[in-house]
Structure formats: C-alpha cells, structure tokens
Curated annotation (Swiss-Prot):
Keywords: Membrane, Mitochondrion, Mitochondrion inner membrane, Oxidoreductase, Transmembrane, Transmembrane helix. It is a single-pass membrane protein. One of its GO terms (biological process) is oxidative phosphorylation. This is Cytochrome c oxidase subunit 6A1, mitochondrial. Pathway: Energy metabolism; oxidative phosphorylation. The gene is COX6A1. It comes from Canis lupus familiaris (Dog).
Length: 20
C-alpha cells in the first residue's frame, strides 16, 4: 500500500499489536 495511507496504518497497527 504505497498510496493508501489508511490501509498501511491499519497494517502497522495490527503488526504492532502482534509485536506487543
């Protein structure tokens, strides 16, 4: 998702949750 910022934000949030 280079253009979709919302999609990337959600993916990063989900990854952060799995990391923590």
């Amino acid at each position: 998702s280079s253009g979709a910022h919302g999609e990337e934000g959600s993916a990063r949030m989900x990854k952060a949750l799995t990391y923590f």
